[in-house]
Amino acid sequence: LPSRGLGDVYKRQLNKNIRVLEIGTGSGYQTAILSKLSRFVYTIERFKTLKLFSESKFKYLKLNNVFCKHSDGGLGWPEQMPFDRIIVTASAPEIPLTLLNQLSADGIMLIPIGEENNDQDLIKIKKKGKKLIKKKIMNVRFVPLLEGKENK
């Protein structure tokens, strides 16, 4: 997401008091940025090699507020909920209720919604108690959010 020109979204939506759930650690670049802008970052990666690679970088950089998990991102991290922010770096055909249920009462989720190999909408979902406020931010193209985890 940083490469998508969302610097202003980060600045307005993150602060040192919040807990972030990131779905899709990848190289850990975005995670490292999030760690400097929030209190805790819980990040899930479905590929074991990527999780181990990025986790070693976090240790080297002494990012002690980052916690990594090798798992199915669509399941979230229920043991650590609720999250003030959830950032999903893979597209889903619709908003995953499992993740939405892990969002705090005033939380915000950023997620690309749409079909694989097509334009998708990056959606900002703000939870106000039991009410959801959805806003399209921009058109994007992300890899799909896949079920399960890979041991490679």
Each PLM stretch: what is its role?
Residues 1-10:
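Single conserved hydrophobic/aromatic residue that forms the stacking wall/gate
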